[in-house]
Amino acid sequence: MQEFYQLYQELVLITLVLTGVVFISVWIFYSLNIALNYLLGACTGVVYLRMLAKDVERLGREKQSLSKTRLALLMALILLASRWNQLQIMPIFLGFLTYKATLIIYVVRVAFISDSPKLRQP
């Protein structure tokens, strides 16, 4: 279980660093409004990642399958963005997907750079 917590902390850290880099880049190249929309989506993605980690942690002990209530978080955010004129759907959605970029970075790092056999096991 210690390995799970270590992986979770690493994924959250990478997500936060990636969020900061992208937020500053979007602010420089676009506008503060779009950057804040991205940041809102990225923060929602971190909350989603935390909810997913809690579900995975309970898997096997208390539950037999993962819950699907996490998706309500994204749906509520997209509905809010579509109703409120200050929010833009695309930057929020792309911000939400930042945690997916973190997973890609982690998989590439483990598969190609690290000598760790975590993902190479059949």
Swiss-Prot record:
GO cellular component: plasma membrane; proton-transporting ATP synthase complex
GO biological process: proton transmembrane transport
InterPro entries: CGL160/ATPI_dom
Main location: membrane
Residue ranges of the TM segments: 11-31, 32-52, 88-108
Protein's UniProt keywords contain Hydrolase: no
Domain of life: Bacteria
Keywords: Cell membrane, CF(0), Hydrogen ion transport, Ion transport, Membrane, Transmembrane, Transmembrane helix, Transport
Location relative to the cell: Cell membrane
Pfam family, one: CGL160_C
Similarity annotation: Belongs to the bacterial AtpI family.
Function of the molecule: A possible function for this protein is to guide the assembly of the membrane sector of the ATPase enzyme complex.
Name assigned to this protein: ATP synthase protein I
